[in-house]
Amino acid sequence: MTITEADFEDSASLGAPPGIAESTWVVMKFGGSSVSTAESWNTIAKLLRRRLDDGLRPVIVHSALQGVSNALASVLESALIGDPSDVLEEIRSQHYALALALNLDGPTMLDETLRELDQLVAGVRLVREVSVRVRVRIMALGELMATRLGAAYLAAQSLPVQWLDARDLLTSRTVGGRQTVANYLSATCDFEPDAELQARLSIGDRIVLTQGFIARNKNGETVLLGRGGSDTSAAYFAGKLSARRLEIWSDVPGMFSADPRVVPSARLLVALHYDEAQELASAGSAVLHPRCISPVRAAAIPLFIRCTASPEIAGTVISSVTEEVEPQVKGICIRNGLTLISMDGVGMWQEVGFLAKAFAAFSENGVSVDLVSTSETNVTVSIDTSDGMLSDDIEESLIDDLEKLCRVRVISKCSAVSLVGRKIRTIIPRLASALEVFEEERIHLMSLAANDLNLSFVVDQQQGLRLVSKLHSTIIRKKGASSVFGSSWERLFASDVASAREPDVWWMKKREQLLKLADGQLNAYVYDRDSVATAAKKLLKLKNISRI
């Protein structure tokens, strides 16, 4: 199905000012799953032709191929302790395979970049150490290789495309006055309208294709915008270009009331205010990076989330205009990988400046605080460690500084389960029965957001997913269709859900044989020869195992 301009709500009706609503720029971001197959690229080419036919100027921002960023991180870890050649070969093969599917010459296009990767990894293996600058250079290669393939394919389809290096277009700013690890791995950029950039990208009326995730600092060094930072890159470009809209194309058609891979009954959220989307993203919804909201909200640029595999699904619209509804919970989210820092001390009660001193320690160590809970004798904060920013050295330095002020206790492997919606405070009494699921669990921290959009509970990580499923079933699952809730994931993708519920295991396929074998026997141990052989062959392919 071809998606036309009529399939998108008019930006003016979504609160965009005239300069935005009348803009011809459209920024389209495609995630890793959306750029990893020939079928997806065929869809992208059709979408771009439609945009050009509608008189728009598309800017494409896309990620590394699916799984490549994780593979590059794995290469770094392997290089510190052993031989990463297996993973390097997987990265090479994945790019070559896509090039072949797109009828492109992969080796000619990518071998120079792959040699650079090999050389950087060889250096890491030699010194058994990886600096933040080397880490950044290696992680950036995924986007650079993927966009080379994408631009070449679109050009082969007779589309007027221009490949540009995002590092020549986005300059990061130094936070805190000095270059910290965060300034390299989770950098930020300005996003105010940029007339010079608009003029530069207008030359030739070509489709601009560039990378997400990467930028350059004022010293000319490559920096990253944090894991999942391609969303943020796209939002920066939308802000700088004063784009008519930002389109996020992913493997899901929008934001849902819970992670649909965990809760198949999760409902599509049809329309959200920027504030609600920001809260959902910050609370753990993986569809959007939390930092991508601010640039579009500042300029009142509408944001549309669509699914590359099912572009006909309207998805989620995020803007400053939403239909007012009664107070309600719109999403149940979870964030794993949290660490709690609990600070105790009788002396902190009514002590002037204690919180200032404590938070100064976090600031000086470059550690961002998430949730906060306080009492007369305790302050507990959560830190999101999932992005790898809290190294052992930084954590040790932070604890040393805090122990000069109070007693400190560290609680690792926690999850934050959050209820996100409108006017949460007013509906807490109505949630009493739903919140009974917490009676059996130890709650380390509870926090009600000052903006009244979020109620969060921090629990042990192994309990998180179970609690999300129970809360969603109690609070959201039975809600009818409305201006907020669309269809459930299982209704939108019924065949996918059915296949997911049928595990691909040998004993399901050989059920009848097993039943016959069990007939007349009290018990028996059964091994499947084919499954054992397949597993053995996988082991034999591992180069780091000396003997099997």
Q: Predicted regions: what is each one?
A:
Residues 1-288, 293, 459-460, 485-494:
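Nucleotide/pyrophosphate-binding catalytic subdomain
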Residues 22-33, 343, 509-524:
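Generic N-terminal amphipathic, Lys/Arg-enriched alpha-helix
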Residues 24-26, 57-60, 96, 160-162, ...:
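Structural motif
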Residues 54, 157, 299, 365, ...:
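Conserved dinucleotide-binding and phosphotransfer motif residues
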Residues 65-66, 168, 252-254, 303, ...:
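Glycine-rich beta-alpha junction loops
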Residues 312-497:
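A conserved regulatory-domain signal marking ACT and ACT-like small-molecule sensing domains
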Residues 483-548:
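A charged N-terminal "starter" segment
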